[in-house]
């Protein structure tokens, strides 16, 4: 695959990315291998919704997964990364229903079967968008194994699990309080409800005693549920209301008398110590109702409208009903007070409609016994969670978990495999469609119309994608999977449920490690949203800066437990880093392009090499060691930092400069040493960097000399202990300190880079002084010195600038090079000009009339000018301070 052509002057990322995506996929470079005697590494992708398009969270998540997969593949492990998408029941149905609405139709106009066909057609036409975008960011999945949660194989798994759990008594059907979305018209699980802070009202309402002897004030945020009140609850020890058990309380606006129940759930010191109990529309009230055998009176229907039980309010929208009831309470003297009240209101996670707690006949999973196994697995260390700060949150949630409502009143999804017999009422739950009732023989069977919660099929993802319930070779080789990488916000939606299902059905954990990454926010730490205009589109970023730049940026920001504040300026900065690598490789190619493998022999005996080569090999060995350690500890940002610091600071800024004279030398031994080390170090860099930036590294690798396969499938470097050389590192660090000192003096004194200068080093340690002297030539070349001396003592000239490195003093005479007084005078004049402009602008910005009357864009422009002038003033002052130090 090696080419003879020299790398182009500039890195044209669009062409390179297209080329390697095509070649990798054409040659099936990422196919799963199951070779005997090798370690296995497997990941299942968190399946994005089939309705989705790539957002920056997807880009982060899949970049981190890809880094691990590429690393383990290069380490020689049997590696499998299964891609796929989720059918996303509610979301997908909503998309297709909106499409139908543009045609003036609803799903009921089509009927269930035709509607489902329409959804499949939509999936065929549009569902591949997110998959193609995941490929575009370089995800090295085994794309031949792509799965969909409604695939035939996965549907078989879902049915099998449902039937098993039902027959074990872990799935049941019951009339319970659920979260209901009036827009989607379906039940939602607890963790599908998003609670948002809301500025509401608290209504204080007088409930009269039935005998007219008094009343009690009860506060509620939801007066529209009053027609559904079936009791008043007080604490058993509250003597104020002890007598009411025999009397009862009148429900305002009606003639109904409500019983008083005594329940320990009531806090007698909170408010008046009395609660209205509406079992059909509040979870806590429902529990009270069950304990006391209260009637269920449902007053709000599936569309969020008041039903016939609401009396004269029937037909009103629930929020309109609230207004009407409050007005009626006021008119009839029952309304005592309305106060502002901040509280959390539940919303549907899909359509954002305010949810309605209501009683409904639904299917549930009894999760307590399943959750206990998952908690034990985490406590025992069978599953590790990264970062560790999530352990307590996990335990707390699992300890307080409630049964999972798994039925959804929609059409798109896995239809529940349960049938009812019309003749005898028998409920039949089987993996295969029954033809007759096993109890009475009737053929009049009707299947449950509800479908399963999308998260039910997703909870089986780690093993259903590998062919369960069949005992496949994939399951034998790759289950449990190695690690799950996902966002922390679906720890309970998905991660915990996979633990429960995996442990119960497979008797093994579904993954050994869980890495929870943070959400990606804008540079100010604010949540990205279209309404605020701060969304960073990864596809636009890739088009502007290149995919590798985006991947490297996301990796650099992915510190465990830390919020990711994405700044486009940093993406641009890392694009410069990619260009730096390209230019360094191009320089190297000019010198090693005609080499063969024999040139590498130099690195086999590093002790015989010159200092610069021994130093870079030692640093390379430590780079590789650090990369292995960081990747196995999921310290992704450290992997980026190690590569960045080594490549930019050590390899490019120091090593390439240090060996230039050898590369152009007539001394063939010195030249071959330099070329051999350069090739080996460059190859190592490409390998350590490849998991993060696959495109640029694969392109550079392909043009290096020799026969080469894909870099993506080459061997990851091992730590070369024989390369480690503490003495070489100490000596090189000393020389780098001297060179840095001389360069700093030149920079601060603003001496032109081409101007030759003299430098003197005062070093009292004779051993270090000898080392410095022995590299006079190298130091002089890298700092453009005319004269260089190393002494134990010397008198510093009056016009010399000084730099202290540890206990070593460096000075450079500046006579004839810099007129400090003239430079200071010039800076002083420039400062006065800037101050005058700044005074004008500050006057404008301090003028209330200007701020109130000028267009927002004009104010923003003036503010920007002020910031630029402030920055310019700071630079002038910095330059003045530097010169004063030299004077």
Swiss-Prot record:
EC number(s) reported in the record: 6.1.1.9
Residue positions of motif 'HIGH' region: 48-58
Binding of ATP, residues: 530
Main location per the UniProt record: cytoplasm
Reactions this protein catalyses: tRNA(Val) + L-valine + ATP = L-valyl-tRNA(Val) + AMP + diphosphate
Pfam families xrefs: Anticodon_1, tRNA-synt_1, Val_tRNA-synt_C
GO molecular function, one term: ATP binding
Keyword GTP-binding in record: no
Annotated motif 'KMSKS' region, positions: 527-531
Transmembrane regions listed in the UniProt entry: none
PANTHER family: VALINE--TRNA LIGASE, CHLOROPLASTIC_MITOCHONDRIAL 2, VALYL-TRNA SYNTHETASES
Family: Belongs to the class-I aminoacyl-tRNA synthetase family. ValS type 1 subfamily.
Protein name: Valine--tRNA ligase
Biological source species: Desulfotalea psychrophila (strain LSv54 / DSM 12343)
Gene: valS
């Amino acid at each position: 695959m090696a080419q003879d052509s020299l790398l182009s002057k500039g890195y044209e990322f669009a062409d390179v990315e297209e080329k390697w995506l095509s070649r990798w996929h054409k040659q099936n470079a990422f196919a799963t291998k199951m070779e005997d005697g090798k370690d296995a590494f497997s990941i299942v992708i968190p399946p994005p919704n089939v309705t989705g398009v790539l957002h920056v969270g997807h880009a982060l998540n899949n970049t981190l997964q890809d880094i691990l997969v590429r690393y383990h593949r290069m380490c020689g492990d049997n590696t499998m990364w299964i891609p796929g998408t989720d059918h996303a029941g509610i979301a997908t149905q909503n998309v297709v229903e909106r499409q139908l609405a543009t045609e003036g139709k609803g799903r009921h106009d089509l009927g269930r079967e035709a509607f489902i066909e329409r959804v499949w057609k939509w999936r065929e036409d549009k569902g591949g968008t997110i998959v193609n975008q995941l490929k575009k960011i370089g995800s090295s999945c085994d794309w031949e194994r792509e799965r969909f949660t409604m695939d035939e194989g996965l549907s078989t798994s879902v049915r099998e699990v449902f039937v098993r759990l039902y027959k074990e008594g872990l799935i049941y059907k019951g009339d319970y309080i659920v979260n209901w979305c009036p827009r989607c018209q379906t039940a939602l699980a607890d963790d599908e409800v998003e609670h948002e802070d809301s500025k509401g009202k608290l209504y204080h309402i007088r409930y009269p005693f039935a005998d007219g002897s008094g009343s009690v004030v009860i506060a509620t945020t939801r007066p529209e549920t009053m027609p559904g009140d079936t009791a008043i609850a007080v604490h058993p020890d509250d003597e104020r209301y002890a007598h009411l058990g025999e009397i009862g309380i009148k429900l305002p606006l009606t003639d109904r008398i409500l019983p008083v129940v005594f329940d320990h759930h009531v806090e007698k010191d909170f408010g008046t110590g009395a609660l209205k109990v509406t079992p059909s529309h509040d979870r806590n009230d429902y529990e009270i109702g069950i304990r006391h055998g209260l009637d269920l009176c449902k007053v709000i229907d599936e569309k969020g409208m008041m039903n016939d039980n609401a009396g004269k309010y029937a037909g009103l929208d629930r929020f309109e009903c609230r207004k009407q009831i409050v007005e009626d309470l006021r008119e009839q003297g029952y309304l005592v007070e309305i106060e502002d009240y901040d509280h959390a209101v539940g919303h549907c996670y899909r359509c954002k409609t305010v949810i309605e707690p209501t009683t409904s006949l639904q299917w549930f999973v009894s999760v307590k016994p399943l959750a206990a196994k998952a908690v034990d697995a985490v406590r025992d260390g069978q599953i590790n969670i990264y970062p560790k700060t999530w352990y307590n949150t996990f335990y707390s949630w699992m300890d307080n978990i409630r049964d999972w409502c798994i039925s959804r009143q929609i059409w798109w999804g896995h239809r529940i495999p349960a049938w009812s017999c019309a003749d005898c009422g028998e409920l039949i739950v089987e993996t295969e469609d029954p033809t007759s009732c096993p109890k009475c023989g009737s053929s009049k069977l009707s299947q449950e119309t509800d479908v399963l919660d999308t998260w039910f099929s997703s909870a089986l993802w780690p093993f259903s994608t590998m062919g369960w319930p069949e005992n496949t070779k994939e399951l034998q080789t790759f289950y449990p999977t190695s690690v799950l990488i996902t966002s922390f916000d679906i720890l309970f939606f998905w991660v915990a449920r996979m633990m429960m299902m995996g442990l119960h059905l497979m008797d093994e954990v579904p993954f050994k490690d869980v890495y929870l990454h943070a959400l990606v926010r804008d540079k100010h730490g604010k949540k990205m949203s279209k309404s605020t205009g701060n969304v960073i589109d990864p596809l636009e970023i890739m088009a502007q800066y290149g995919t590798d730049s985006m991947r490297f940026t996301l990796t650099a920001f992915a510190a465990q437990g830390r919020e990711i504040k994405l700044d486009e300026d940093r993406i641009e900065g890392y694009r410069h880093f990619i260009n730096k690598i390209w230019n360094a490789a191009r320089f190297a190619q000019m010198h090693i392009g005609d080499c063969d493998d024999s040139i590498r022999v130099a690195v086999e005996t590093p002790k015989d090499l010159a200092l610069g080569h021994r130093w870079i090999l030692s640093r390379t060995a430590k780079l590789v060691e650090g990369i292995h350690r960081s990747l196995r500890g999921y310290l992704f940002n450290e992997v980026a930092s190690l590569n960045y610091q080594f490549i930019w600071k050590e390899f490019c800024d120091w090593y390439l400069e240090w060996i230039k004279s050898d590369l152009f030398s007539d001394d063939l031994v010195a030249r071959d040493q330099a070329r051999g080390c350069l090739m080996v170090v460059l190859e190592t860099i490409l390998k350590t960097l490849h998991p993060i930036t696959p495109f640029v590294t694969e392109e550079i690798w392909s043009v290096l000399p020799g026969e080469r396969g894909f870099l993506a499938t080459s061997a990851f470097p091992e730590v070369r202990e024989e390369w480690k050389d503490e003495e070489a590192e100490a000596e090189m660090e000393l020389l780098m300190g001297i060179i840095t000192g001389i360069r700093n003096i030149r920079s601060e004194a603003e001496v032109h880079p081409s101007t030759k200068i003299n430098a003197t080093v005062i070093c009292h340690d004779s051993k270090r002084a000898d080392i410095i002297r022995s590299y006079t030539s190298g130091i002089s070349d890298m700092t453009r010195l005319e004269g260089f001396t190393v002494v134990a003592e010397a008198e510093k000239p009056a016009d010399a600038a000084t730099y202290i490195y540890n206990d070593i003093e460096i000075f450079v005479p500046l006579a004839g090079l810099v007129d400090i007084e003239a430079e200071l005078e010039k800076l002083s004049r420039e400062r006065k000009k800037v101050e005058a402009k700044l005074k004008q602008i500050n006057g404008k910005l301090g003028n209330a009339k200007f701020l109130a009357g000028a267009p927002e864009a004009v104010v923003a422009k003036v503010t920007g000018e002020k910031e630029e002038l402030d920055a310019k003033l700071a630079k002038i002052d910095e330059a003045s301070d530097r010169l004063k130090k030299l004077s």
